[in-house]
Each structure stands twice: as structure tokens, then as C-alpha cells.
């Protein structure tokens, strides 16, 4: 399959998996116009829409796409039932689209009903994990988001993280504010800064990369623990994760 990202709004990406014959899967279409333009340009035939959660910038284009393509199947978690979903999915479900198998797992935190879709090597993780960061806790808890991160971290290192926002540069600036002397973080920050200066995308990224530069996956690293302990003494991984999320909220 071919992976394409369609920019939307200020910093969203709408992901599309397409076959050489033009049939395709659309992930989190927050608005219809750029998707319809890409469909026309590439002569795609949409087969399915995958929704990760209920926020408008991820579901806003569903109604218009269903009107244009009445046979399209829309998958999503229970929290998206009023957003045009035709088949509700939950943790542990599996589906096959265009001959490709997808595993669905629950990743609460950003919202309570958030789900991710994994079809090797692609992970469509919505607003759970970003390159260098994690989603805001609008509905869930730090404990829930930490456990969601652990689910993602259990995937193969070559997994491609297809998140829904271009937040990488801001996330790396935050990471540098926490660990300014970390070589991996510095190297990646400079790489990302160069890409964004050229208006190039930083996504997708491998899980292997995230394990090196994403502080939310490194809450048990001694360097980060030492940094946190300069301000407070937190003994548990979840507490350190929550500390990081709070710091990022205020950054």
C-alpha cells in the first residue's frame, strides 16, 4: 500500500492508504475539501474511513465524504457513533480492508474512547502519541495515557507512527528544555528544525526513533529521573509521566 498524508487546518494530517488500483482508506478526515481534492487528483476510490476519536478536527469531513461516496464504510470507537460511524470498534477488534488486517486497541487519555489502528508497519494513533510528545489529557488521566503509551511501545521498533498533528518541532523544543544536554534530542531537534524551515513534513517516524527522543517513552531513564528529582521525588513511572505532561501543558 502507499501512504500519503494530506495537510488540513493549521497542523493536522489526514492519512490515506491507497492501493495501486486506486482503492483507498482514509484516516481521521477532519475536513472534506482537501480529501476530495486529493481523491480527484489521484483518481482514488474510497473504501473506508477510520476514526480514532470524536474531536471535530478528526471527524468533520465524514458527513460530506459519505454524501459523495454512499457505499463507504466508516469505522470508529463508540464515542464517534454520532459522527457518521457505520461500524463501531473497540479494544481487541480486528478488521480486514483491501486485504490488509488491522488490529484495534484502546488508548484512552486524550479522550476516554480513543482507539488506534495497527496494520504492520503502520500505526494510526490519532492524538495519543506525537513525535516527541503525547496528546493532552482532555478526558483521561495520566495513568491511562501512560498505559496507552506502553501498548504502543510493545509494537515492533520499525512501526511507523502516523500521528495526526505536525507538533514535532514544538515537542523537541520542550524536550530540550528538560534535557538540554541529551545528544539524541539535540540531533533530532536540529534535523526537525531544518525540515520545518523547508516546510517539509516530519512524519511518519519509527517507534525506534521515538524510543530515543520521546521523553514520555523515557520516564524510566536515569537521566530523566535525575532531572525530575531536582524538583521533586517521584518514585513511580506514572507520576513522572504526569509530571512531564504538566510541564508540557505550561511550556
Swiss-Prot record:
This protein's UniProt keywords: Hydrolase, Metal-binding, Zinc
Pathway: Secondary metabolite metabolism; methylglyoxal degradation; (R)-lactate from methylglyoxal: step 2/2
CDD domains assigned: hydroxyacylglutathione_hydrolase_MBL-fold (cd07723)
GO molecular function: hydroxyacylglutathione hydrolase activity; metal ion binding
Keyword Acyltransferase on entry: no
Database matches in InterPro entries: Clx_II_MBL (IPR035680), Glyoxalase_II_hydrolase (IPR050110), HAGH_C (IPR032282), Hydroxyacylglutathione_Hdrlase (IPR017782), Metallo-B-lactamas (IPR001279), RibonucZ/Hydroxyglut_hydro (IPR036866)
Single Gene Ontology BP annotation: methylglyoxal catabolic process to D-lactate via S-lactoyl-glutathione
Primary enzyme class: hydrolase
Cofactor: Zn(2+)
Entry superkingdom: Bacteria
Reactions mediated catalytically: an S-(2-hydroxyacyl)glutathione + H2O = a 2-hydroxy carboxylate + glutathione + H(+)
EC number: 3.1.2.6
Entry binding sites for Zn(2+) 1: 53, 55, 110, 127
Cofactor remark: Binds 2 Zn(2+) ions per subunit.
Residues given in the record as Zn(2+) 2 binding sites: 57-58, 127, 165
Family: Belongs to the metallo-beta-lactamase superfamily. Glyoxalase II family.
Quaternary structure note: Monomer.
Protein known as: Hydroxyacylglutathione hydrolase
Taxonomic placement: Bacteria, Pseudomonadati, Pseudomonadota, Gammaproteobacteria, Enterobacterales
Gene name, Swiss-Prot/TrEMBL: gloB
Amino acid at each position: 500500500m502507499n501512504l500519503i498524508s494530506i495537510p488540513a487546518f493549521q497542523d493536522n494530517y489526514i492519512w490515506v492508504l491507497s492501493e495501486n488500483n486506486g482503492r483507498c482508506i482514509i484516516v481521521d478526515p477532519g475536513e472534506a475539501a482537501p480529501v476530495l481534492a486529493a481523491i480527484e487528483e489521484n483518481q482514488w476510490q474510497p473504501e473506508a474511513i477510520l476514526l480514532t476519536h470524536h474531536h471535530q478536527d478528526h471527524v468533520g469531513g465524514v458527513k460530506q465524504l459519505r454524501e459523495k461516496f454512499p457505499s463507504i464504510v466508516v469505522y470508529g470507537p463508540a464515542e464517534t457513533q454520532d459522527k457518521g460511524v457505520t461500524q463501531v470498534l473497540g479494544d481487541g477488534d480486528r478488521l480486514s480492508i483491501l486485504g490488509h488486517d488491522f488490529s484495534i486497541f484502546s488508548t484512552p487519555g486524550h479522550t476516554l474512547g480513543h482507539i488506534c489502528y495497527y496494520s504492520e508497519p503502520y500505526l494510526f494513533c490519532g492524538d495519543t502519541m506525537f513525535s516527541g510528545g503525547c496528546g493532552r489529557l482532555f478526558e483521561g488521566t495520566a495513568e491511562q495515557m501512560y498505559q496507552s503509551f506502553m501498548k504502543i511501545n510493545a509494537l515492533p521498533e520499525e512501526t511507523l507512527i502516523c500521528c495526526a498533528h505536525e507538533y514535532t518541532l514544538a515537542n523537541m523544543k520542550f524536550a530540550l528544555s528538560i534535557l538540554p544536554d541529551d545528544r539524541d534530542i539535540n540531533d533530532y531537534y536540529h534535523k526537525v528544525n531544518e525540515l520545518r524551515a523547508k516546510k517539509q513534513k516530519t512524519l511518519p517516524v519509527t517507534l525506534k526513533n521515538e524510543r530515543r527522543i520521546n521523553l514520555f517513552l523515557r520516564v524510566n531513564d536515569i537521566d530523566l529521573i535525575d532531572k525530575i528529582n531536582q524538583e521533586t521525588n517521584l518514585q513511580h513511572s506514572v507520576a513522572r509521566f504526569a509530571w512531564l505532561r504538566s510541564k508540557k501543558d505550561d511550556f
